[in-house]
């Protein structure tokens, strides 16, 4: 249930009854401090101004029309006209019961949409590096959240599988195969690409052959298509290992590489010309956009076809947006691409809108993100200054977690220890990233992310096992607990219950804004509130069975919420730590 939405509707009706316009915005928000209640309605200021009255006067009139019986125990006006709403303990108890009775914890399903999510996007014949981490895991958290809410989500892995470099790569693969070293060379993708580039730069005959191969590949020659396909297959097989290690839901079926849009490009250029949007300029085909200015203050020219007939990333991105609307029938498209690509995307989408390829009713959203930095505040690199391979980063995470877990559990069986180390190590890397606002850069710090205190994966995983341990000690049957009533009589019970019931509101924000850090902050808050509740409200030694069972049910909803919330982030939970 979305309590915020319920209160918004009630306050809005009361505002209209008090003379506010029908489109008034009640601005119901979760209260930041306990003394201001559970929710605040802050919309009186803006509406009172329009009505030419004092906000407090409007708030008083709204209260005469506001019926929150059975929902709120107290409603009061604070300051210049804020309305503070304190939820009724019996209402909280009833909602906790309903949440526990539902596999979805009472989370409702919005109108189902088809949502395309573009994320990860590694390049063929190159190993994934740390620069791919953010797009991959933030995008996947968004996908998991949207799917949980009931949307039809299409994962689009926009792999870099096309371009002039493929002539060079095919020529090098051919040379390696002639020397019976093709498979061995491809086992080290990074080395393969580096060696191919070295030959291309130093051997003119090789470079000439590579340029000819590009033409043959682009003309659809079967032999060159087969060689190209081999490069794609080997790369994606290696990438799949990384996706599986990261507990990311991408599979081979989600690959929608740049090559997919090639057949569309000539038609798009011709259509943009026919619509008068594209013109010839110095031999190239260009779209001039008034919305973007060059240094001289003139409309910026965006090239969609070069003088030599080649196409650009912008052309592909125009085709891509068109395809996602016309073929995939997207109601919404989310792009998890770093912030440096923002202007490029905005230009492509401006052309898309002007050409009528995607209507304004279908949002194209750039969910951009900042960079991962080292402790020195510079882009995260190896000690030698090279790019950090993602596989190497995950190996190190596993090794560090292994040491940490073994230290705390010296007698744990090896297989159990390995499983726990994997959950903690991979979880730590992912959570450290997901818990930061995606729009900002963040410092990558092993010590912080593997700490058992603070907003970290190990702390959250431990918090979950701590709640489960209460049930093990209680030795109670879940079915027997189901019929027990929930009683909210203590402040800490009410605070924990109210926060647990804000799970749907949190999911809604993550789905709308693409901000998994909001879920991390929520879960961390829940864990903290449970800790205070556990300390001050005895569960197993409660004064009677009714209170004991009620508190066990609050613990039960806490465990389920933590598990489900962490699952939407792609973070594994464990039963014991």
Swiss-Prot record:
Keyword check for Nucleotide-binding, yes or no. yes
Q: Show the Gene3D superfamilies listed in the entry.
A: Arginyl tRNA synthetase N-terminal domain, HUPs, Isoleucyl-tRNA Synthetase, Domain 1
| Reactions catalysed, as given in the entry | tRNA(Arg) + L-arginine + ATP = L-arginyl-tRNA(Arg) + AMP + diphosphate
Q: Which GO terms describe its molecular function?
A: arginine-tRNA ligase activity; ATP binding
Q: Which domain of life is it from?
A: Bacteria
* Renumbered ranges of motif 'HIGH' region: 122-132
What's its top-level EC category? ligase
- Membrane-spanning regions, if any? none
Which family is annotated?
Belongs to the class-I aminoacyl-tRNA synthetase family.
Q: Which HAMAP family match?
A: Arg_tRNA_synth (MF_00123)
Q: What is the protein name for this chain?
A: Arginine--tRNA ligase
